C-alpha cells in the first residue's frame, strides 16, 4: 500500500471538564477495522502502521492513540480505568460506527474485552495481540542493537 494514502486526523474527547485532543490515522475502504495500540509510554498508533498498511487493501482501517499516550501532549489527568473505558466508549459511540473488527494490543485488549462485555453484539470480531513483546529498548532506539541481547540476559539472570 502507498503510505501517502494514510490520512491523519484529530479527535476530541472531554473528561472531567478537560478537552483532550488525540490523533488517528485512517486508510483503505471496506468493512471497518479499528486498531488499538498498547497502553505504554512508548506506544503510539504508529506501531500499528505495518498492520494498517496490510489490512487497508481490504478494509477501512482506523488507528487511534489513547489519551495520555501517543503523540499528543499529555494533559495533567489521572488516567484511571474509568477514564480509559469512557474514552473507548466515546470512540465506539462517536468516532467509528459499524465496526467489523478490532485489533487490540497489550493492555488495550483488557479495555476492549470490558467494552464487549458491556455491549454484546457491537463488535463483530476481536484480535488480541501483544506487539510490544520485544520490550521498550528497540522501540526507543529505533531498532535492535548488539548489546541488547547481553542486557536482556543480565536482567533475566536470577539474583543471589
Region annotations inferred by a language model:
Residues 49, 89, 113-117:
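Short, hydrophobic alpha-helix immediately C-terminal to the catalytic nucleophile
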Residues 103-112:
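Gly/Ala-rich beta-loop-alpha elbow adjacent to hydrolase catalytic centers
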Residues 32, 58-60, 99-101, 122-125:
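Structural signature of beta-strand start/N-cap positions in the alpha/beta core
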Residues 16-71:
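Conserved HGGG/HGGXW glycine-rich cap/lid loop of the alpha/beta-hydrolase fold
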Amino acid at each position: 500500500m502507498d503510505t501517502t494514502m494514510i490520512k491523519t486526523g484529530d479527535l476530541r474527547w472531554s473528561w472531567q471538564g478537560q478537552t483532550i485532543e488525540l490523533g488517528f490515522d485512517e486508510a483503505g475502504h471496506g468493512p471497518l477495522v479499528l486498531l488499538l495500540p498498547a497502553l505504554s509510554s512508548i506506544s503510539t498508533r504508529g506501531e500499528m502502521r505495518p498492520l494498517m498498511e496490510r489490512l487497508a487493501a481490504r478494509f477501512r482501517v482506523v488507528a487511534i492513540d489513547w489519551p495520555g499516550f501517543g503523540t499528543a501532549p499529555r494533559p495533567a489527568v489521572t488516567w484511571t480505568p474509568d477514564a480509559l473505558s469512557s474514552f473507548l466508549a466515546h470512540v465506539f459511540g462517536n468516532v467509528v460506527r459499524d465496526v467489523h473488527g478490532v485489533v487490540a494490543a497489550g493492555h488495550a485488549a483488557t479495555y476492549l474485552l470490558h467494552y464487549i462485555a458491556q455491549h454484546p453484539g457491537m463488535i463483530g470480531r476481536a484480535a488480541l495481540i501483544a506487539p510490544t513483546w520485544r520490550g521498550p529498548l528497540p522501540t526507543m532506539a529505533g531498532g535492535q542493537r548488539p548489546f541488547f541481547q547481553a542486557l536482556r540476559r543480565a536482567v533475566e539472570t536470577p539474583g543471589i
